[in-house]
Amino acid sequence: RRAGLLVALSEGFTPRPKISFGLALPTGAESVAEYVDIDLRPDISAADLGLDSLAGRRAFTEGLSAALPIGFDVVVVAERPAGAGSLQDSVTTCTWEFWHPRLTTEDHRRACQLMAADTLVIERERKGKLSTDDVRPLILDLFTKFAGSDIAAGREGDGSVLVADLSTVGRGLRLSEFAELAYPGHDARDVRAMRTHQWTEGPDGRREVLDAPDADLAVAGPAGIAPLAEAPA
């Protein structure tokens, strides 16, 4: 309402704005950016919002950012194709960075050895009963790197991080469960995690849910908008 968007409403006795965020961010985790779906009224087109030109899209993102709380900025907006599923359902993989001041590059390298395991069985509690699950198929890739200088400056430690591609299909793997596997001997609750990418599978392979450079050049049409908003760390 503050941004002047004519948002579509759900049906029923208590209509609600059709606004939905993508894959939920786990409690305590950080994120580089998040996605949100905003359904517009059927009589509103992208051209009505000025989204059919580069200048119009820039003006739109600036205006929407100004209506958001301090620390949140809309960086790109694009059409969500008519009939497309929800953002949460489309995400199949997330890329994470894990670090802690007491974790070293060698700790991260040892964690990468999980890729060599055939199985990784953990115990989970369901409805008061313990069960076992093999979570090895959920760990798609692991490698270590040094964070960029702008990020490392705000972190204690040697600046190294573990980068993990984790599947979101099915029940998924909790960050705490992964941290316990990756860093035995360390308290998993102390391990920091930042989501850097959300991926979806398409005919051309894996791609970002919303690719910023492509979206900025695309001609938007009716249906809805899917802005990517930066979340504060």
Residue ranges and their predicted role:
Residues 1, 36-38, 90-100:
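Short glycine-/aliphatic-rich beta-strand segments at the starts of folded cytosolic domains
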Residues 7-43, 82:
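Short, charge-patterned binding micro-sites
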Residues 38-44, 98-103, 164-168:
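Short beta-strand-to-loop capping motifs
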Residues 1-8, 62-70, 116-120, 180-187:
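Short, intrinsically disordered, mixed-charge
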Residues 44-62, 102-115, 170-177:
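Short, conserved charged micro-motifs
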Residues 23, 78-86, 125-129, 138-141:
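Glycine-rich, charged/polar anion/phosphate-binding loops
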Residues 16, 113-233:
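Core RNA-modification/binding signature centered on pseudouridine synthases
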Residues 32-91:
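Ordered, amphipathic secondary-structure segments that act as subunit-interaction surfaces
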